[in-house]
């Protein structure tokens, strides 16, 4: 009887334990929630939220590495760290002229807007000559980080220190009448630049040996062998000069009243031409204001030559130093179709003027290599050619006193009869003498260019020559011929 009772009691106990087990054990998901780690409040940087970084770093000391772990970006970390470590260097707004300031450790950097430079963007580069010619109308020079403008002869500097005001009715370098339609000359860009390889070395042909005698009287009737028709330069192509478009053009005429060379009017008494032209006629005169050699238009005038000044280093074999100045017996009266071209300043000309894309050449030369002389004055826009291409194209020596201009394939060029004539370059509606038509291999031949005397190499020489009055009169009625190499 006792054993059955024990079995009943044991079964009841086990059933109770099973019921109690349901309250002692929970499911795995519930257990994981209970045992999960609770995030510590205000734990150090590796546990902080990004938005609380600056607040937390003010309460405790941060390291760069800890800040980098939060931002996960070097630029953002550096931006915060520079200010956090030593303060904001840009707080005082040190950058001028709307420059953007960037803070650094113990320093700052300014990113300047275009046209400004310097530590604080305080320098206005647009005023310097390398940009927009310093806003100068003509010559631009830099002195102590500022621009100094100046003008050619016949102009005065305006009160604003930039503009050039003519002092007379026919100033140099101005066309005496603007064409109604856009001309070739007007189409010449004054902002375009020549090829990057064009460089002009600092050289002046007037810097000669001081022991040389600057003046020697020569026999004007002496003749000299020519280089040959195919090499004498020389307008093929181009267009006619309209009224007032080429007023600086002069024409050298022989005893038969035939034009044989050109020239450039420099002033009322002086004409610039090529030295090799002096040996193509025993006697000659200078005609100005001519646009049509077969028709008188009323503005033409003929002047006798009083003194001929030829560079004494002119070499007939190479045509080096191919330059001469003529002094007239009577002054030129400036008017429609008769006005001088401007002489530039050398440094400005080589850095600014001769880096333009094109120049203008004019003359009465042949219209093609074996053709007749043109009876009408023509003009042609010719691009400057980089020196390396110039030298490679020529069968003859290209000296430092020469430069190339023209087209290697286009059938446009100067030609026989244009020699000595003007090569001018336009800058802001003023034309400056940059070359003298000298020579070339044929006319408009493929792969060949026109060769010009580089006037910028002779500006001192020209200035000295224009101050020369000549030697005592010779008995001959022919003009004096002086070989001149003015000293430095």
UniProtKB/Swiss-Prot annotation:
The active site is at 276 (charge relay system), 322 (charge relay system), 419 (charge relay system). Gene3D superfamilies: Coagulation Factor IX (4.10.740.10), Laminin (2.10.25.10), Trypsin-like serine proteases (2.40.10.10). Residues 1-31 form the signal peptide. Residues 235-467 form the Peptidase S1 domain. PROSITE patterns: ASX_HYDROXYL (PS00010), EGF_1 (PS00022), EGF_2 (PS01186), EGF_3 (PS50026), EGF_CA (PS01187), GLA_1 (PS00011), GLA_2 (PS50998), TRYPSIN_DOM (PS50240). Residues 183-203, 476-485 are annotated as: O-glycosylated at one site. The vitamin K-dependent, enzymatic carboxylation of some glutamate residues allows the modified protein to bind calcium. N- and O-glycosylated. O-glycosylated with core 1 or possibly core 8 glycans. Its EC number is 3.4.21.6. Changing residue 306 to A: No significant effects on activity for cleavage of PAR-2/F2RL1. Residues 86-122, 125-165 form the EGF-like domain. InterPro entries: Coagulation_fac-like_Gla_dom, EGF-like_Ca-bd_dom, EGF-like_dom, EGF-type_Asp/Asn_hydroxyl_site, EGF_Ca-bd_CS, GLA-like_dom_SF, GLA_domain, Pept_S1A_FX. Changing residue 383 to S: In FA10D; Friuli. The keyword Lyase does not apply. It catalyses: Selective cleavage of Arg-|-Thr and then Arg-|-Ile bonds in prothrombin to form thrombin. Changing residue 47 to G: In FA10D; St. Louis II; strongly reduced activity; not activated by factor VIIa and tissue factor. Changing residue 345 to A: No significant effects on activity for cleavage of PAR-2/F2RL1. Residues 32-40, 183-234 form a propeptide. GO terms for cellular component: endoplasmic reticulum lumen; external side of plasma membrane; extracellular region; extracellular space; Golgi lumen; plasma membrane. Residues 41-85 form the Gla domain. Changing residue 390 to F: In FA10D; Padua 4. Changing residue 421 to D: In FA10D; significant loss of activity. The two chains are formed from a single-chain precursor by the excision of two Arg residues and are held together by 1 or more disulfide bonds. Forms a heterodimer with SERPINA5. Interacts (inactive and activated) with ixolaris, an anticoagulant protein from Ixodes scapularis saliva. Interacts (activated) with iripin-8, a serine protease inhibitor from Ixodes ricinus saliva. Interacts (activated) with FXa-directed anticoagulant from Aedes albopictus saliva. Interacts (activated) with guianensin, an anticoagulant protein from Simulium guianense saliva. Factor Xa is a vitamin K-dependent glycoprotein that converts prothrombin to thrombin in the presence of factor Va, calcium and phospholipid during blood clotting. Factor Xa activates pro-inflammatory signaling pathways in a protease-activated receptor (PAR)-dependent manner. Up-regulates expression of protease-activated receptors (PARs) F2R, F2RL1 and F2RL2 in dermal microvascular endothelial cells. Triggers the production of pro-inflammatory cytokines, such as MCP-1/CCL2 and IL6, in cardiac fibroblasts and umbilical vein endothelial cells in PAR-1/F2R-dependent manner. It is linked to Factor X deficiency: A hemorrhagic disease with variable presentation. Affected individuals can manifest prolonged nasal and mucosal hemorrhage, menorrhagia, hematuria, and occasionally hemarthrosis. Some patients do not have clinical bleeding diathesis. Belongs to the peptidase S1 family. This is Coagulation factor X.
């Amino acid at each position: 009887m006792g054993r059955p009772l024990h079995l009943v009691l044991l079964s009841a106990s086990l059933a109770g334990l099973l019921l109690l087990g349901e309250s002692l054990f929970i499911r795995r998901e519930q257990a994981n929630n209970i045992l999960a780690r609770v995030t510590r409040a205000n734990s150090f940087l590796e546990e902080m939220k990004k938005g609380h970084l600056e607040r937390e770093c003010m309460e405790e000391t941060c390291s760069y590495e800890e800040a980098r772990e939060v931002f996960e970006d070097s630029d953002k970390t550096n931006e915060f760290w520079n200010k956090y470590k030593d303060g904001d260097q840009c707080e005082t707004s040190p950058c001028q002229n709307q420059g953007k300031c960037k803070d650094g450790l113990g320093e700052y950097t300014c990113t300047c807007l275009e046209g400004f430079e310097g530590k604080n963007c305080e320098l206005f580069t647009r005023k310097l000559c390398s940009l927009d010619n310093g806003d100068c109308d003509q010559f631009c020079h830099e002195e102590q980080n500022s621009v100094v403008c100046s003008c050619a002869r016949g102009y005065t500097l305006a009160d604003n220190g930039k503009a050039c005001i003519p002092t007379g009715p026919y100033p140099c370098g101005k066309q005496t009448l603007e064409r109604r339609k856009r001309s070739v000359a007007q189409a010449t860009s004054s902002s375009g630049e020549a090829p990057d390889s064009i460089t002009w070395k600092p050289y002046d042909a007037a810097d000669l040996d001081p022991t040389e005698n600057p003046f020697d009287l020569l026999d004007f009737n002496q003749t000299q062998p020519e280089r040959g028709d195919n090499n004498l330069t020389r307008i093929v192509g181009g267009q006619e000069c309209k009224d007032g478009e080429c007023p600086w053009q002069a024409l050298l005429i022989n005893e038969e009243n035939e034009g044989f060379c050109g020239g450039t009017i420099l002033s009322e008494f002086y004409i610039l031409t090529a030295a090799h032209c002096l040996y193509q006629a025993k006697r000659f005169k200078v005609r100005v204001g001519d646009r049509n050699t077969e028709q008188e238009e009323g503005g033409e005038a003929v002047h006798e030559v009083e003194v001929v000044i030829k560079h004494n280093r002119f070499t007939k074999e190479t045509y080096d130093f191919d330059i001469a100045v003529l002094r007239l017996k009577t002054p030129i009266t400036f008017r429609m179709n008769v006005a001088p071209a401007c002489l530039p300043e050398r440094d400005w000309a080589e850095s600014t003027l001769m880096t333009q894309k094109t120049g203008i050449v004019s003359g009465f030369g042949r219209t093609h290599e074996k053709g007749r002389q043109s009876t009408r004055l023509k003009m042609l826009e010719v691009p400057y050619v980089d020196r390396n291409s110039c030298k490679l194209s020529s069968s003859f020596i290209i000296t430092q006193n020469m430069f190339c201009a023209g087209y290697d394939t286009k059938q446009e060029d100067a030609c026989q009869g244009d020699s000595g004539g003007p090569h001018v370059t336009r800058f802001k509606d003023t034309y400056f003498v940059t070359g003298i038509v000298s020579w070339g291999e044929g006319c408009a031949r493929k792969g060949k260019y026109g060769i010009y005397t580089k006037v910028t190499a002779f500006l001192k020489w020209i200035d000295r020559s224009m101050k020369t009055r000549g030697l005592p009169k010779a008995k001959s009625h022919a003009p004096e011929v002086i070989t001149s190499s003015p000293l430095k």
